[in-house]
A protein has these predicted regions:
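Short, amphipathic alpha-helical interface elements at domain boundaries
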Residues: 1-103, 109-134, 146-224
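Accessory beta->alpha helical hairpin/"wing" motif in late/C-terminal subdomains of nucleic-acid enzymes
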Residues: 92-94, 101, 105-177, 230-240, ...
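Amphipathic alpha-helical scaffolding segments comprising HEAT/armadillo-like alpha-solenoid repeats
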Residues: 239-241, 314-315, 343-354, 375-386, ...
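Charged, amphipathic alpha-helical linkers/stalks
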Residues: 281, 299-333
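Short inter-helical turns and helix N-cap capping residues of alpha-solenoid HEAT/ARM repeat scaffolds
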Residues: 281, 357-360, 387-392, 458-459, ...
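Structural detector for internal amphipathic alpha-helices that build alpha-solenoid repeat scaffolds
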Residues: 319-323, 330-340, 362-373, 384, ...
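Alpha-helical adaptor scaffolds
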Residues: 335-337, 397-450
């Protein structure tokens, strides 16, 4: 994923709603409870972790004692000792989150004493943005923890002096972090894609395959599928760690599918939804979408949210929505128009649509689409540009669609210029789509001698459009005519 190409825009709830969601997450709510529970007798070890002797009391303060802490499907099969151990582990994680987010501060490292951190008060008196900043710190820490090997693996490589021999681990910290970051980025993209059903969960095997199998591979090899299975189990462990942050709704891999040493059954899941769900599914929450977007922005990616452009000028709107899908572009435009008077908005859009740069045709297409959302109050603005060589064509289209009278007939030069501009915009928006192929066929069929005139059109994209028509038209004779016309257009531009 390139950090220069804008990501699809996402629709986010308000900061107030997101902050409420953050406060309700298991990890942050437990961290806050432990921060308030801590007192003068609370002690931490050299790493800031709660001392082992106080874990049971911390678990009790969180209400995690008794049955299995999470109360899962197999809770009845868990012994009291196992339940207590699990509860203490979750209490330890919550305490670590309290320290990582500044809800608790270590007063004296030698004595192991603590006090409430300054951020604790912000959870109740701070702004939504301040609450979300605290939650983001918890998320960052959880993502870092999820990239670290399992504790049992660390114990296996501990030497006699109690030091961990990291060289004995089959673990590359950077590669592990990059793997998880890649998975989370792909989950973000899958969630942001407007073609995907809203709120649809992503099967864990598909998510694993997205970072293992190259995009240009149609049929994965057996070795690739084995790697997907291994990656799926890594993700199962990692999302178990991340789920309490509220990042995602997660259904783990069905334990009946697991065989010795914690590996998944090798067979590929069927396409039936019930079967896929047994292999684990994950759905990014609105809070998770917000969190991953914040991380992507920090990493330098262009990760827009719907509404970002509503307060900016028309030039920012038309340039910004160039890479949006049609639904997102319309939603962004509706928010932009809602803040403006129709006539003033139309004039601003038309002024921003001018230009001879490579993005200008798509900008004019988006201008035309935006103007379709404006009522007849905008008519004076459209009449003002009827003689404009770049805008006169779309102005006539708008006036005709709105039933206006006294629309001057366009010149042949304007008709052909608008045709080239329209095809150039469609090329930029859709590439070689079926709709564009149909448009190309229709143009060649409707206009006798089309190519004899088209190559003379004074438009920066004339040669590119004619080359595309030669590439897309199914009739070899007509395609050859288009290529010849493109050559003439190139020669004319060079001269």
């Amino acid at each position: 994923m390139s950090d220069s190409t804008p990501l699809p825009p996402v629709r986010l709830p308000s900061e107030a709603e997101l902050a409420r969601d953050a406060l309700a997450t298991p990890l942050l709510s437990r961290a806050a409870r432990l921060a308030r529970w801590a007192g003068p007798d609370t002690r931490v070890d050299s790493g800031g972790g709660l001392v082992e002797e106080q874990l049971a009391a911390a678990a009790e303060a969180l209400g995690l004692t008794g049955r299995s802490a999470e109360g899962g499907a197999d809770a009845g099969a868990v012994t009291d000792a196992e339940a207590a151990e699990e509860a203490q582990a979750e209490a330890s994680e919550a305490w670590r989150a309290a320290v990582d987010t500044g809800l608790v501060e270590v007063l004296d490292e030698e004595e192991g004493t603590v006090r409430a951190g300054d951020n604790l008060a912000l959870l109740t008196s701070g702004s939504p943005a301040e609450v979300l900043h605290i939650w983001l710190d918890a998320l960052d820490a959880a993502i870092a923890d999820a990239s670290v090997p399992d504790f049992d693996d660390l114990m296996d490589v501990m030497d006699e002096g109690g030091e961990i021999d990291f060289s004995s681990l089959d673990w590359d910290p950077q590669a592990e972090a990059e793997f998880l970051e890649g998975v989370l980025a792909n989950l973000y993209l899958l969630t942001a894609d407007e073609r995907a059903p809203e709120g649809a969960p992503v099967p864990l095997p598909a998510l694993a395959a997205s970072v293992v199998v190259p995009s240009d591979v149609a049929e994965p090899t057996d070795a690739m599928m084995e790697e997907v299975s291994t990656a799926m189990m890594r993700l199962d462990d990692q999302f178990r760690i991340l789920a309490p942050t509220g990042l995602a709704d997660f259904r783990p891999v069905d334990e009946s599918l697991l065989i010795e040493e914690g590996q998944a059954a090798p067979q590929t899941p069927d396409d039936e939804p019930e079967d896929l769900e047994r292999y684990g599914v994950v759905r990014l929450t609105p809070l998770g979408l917000y969190g991953l977007r914040a991380r992507l922005l920090d990493a330098g990616y262009a990760a827009p949210a719907l509404g970002d452009l509503a307060g900016k000028g028309a030039d920012a709107l038309l340039d910004g929505t160039v890479h949006y899908g049609p639904l997102a572009a319309r939603a962004e435009t509706e928010q932009w128009l809602a803040r403006r008077e129709p006539l003033a908005a139309a004039r601003e859009l038309l002024a921003a649509a001018r230009g001879g740069d490579a993005d200008a045709p798509l900008r004019r297409l988006h201008c035309q689409q935006a103007l379709s959302l404006v009522g007849t109050e905008a008519e004076p603005a459209l009449r003002e540009v009827l003689d404009d060589p770049e805008l006169g064509g779309l102005a006539r289209v708008w006036l005709a669609e709105h039933g206006a009278a006294d629309i001057p007939a366009p010149s042949q030069e304007l008709v052909f210029w608008l045709t080239v501009d329209t095809v150039a915009a469609q090329l930029a928006a859709e590439g070689n789509s079926e709709e564009l192929v149909a448009l190309v066929e229709g143009l060649a069929a409707q206009h006798s001698g089309f190519f004899d005139t088209a190559w003379r059109v004074d438009h920066p994209a004339t040669a590119e459009v004619l080359e595309a028509m030669g590439r897309l038209h199914p009739d070899k004779r007509i395609a050859k005519e288009a290529r010849k016309a493109a050559y003439k257009a190139r020669s004319q531009q060079a001269g």
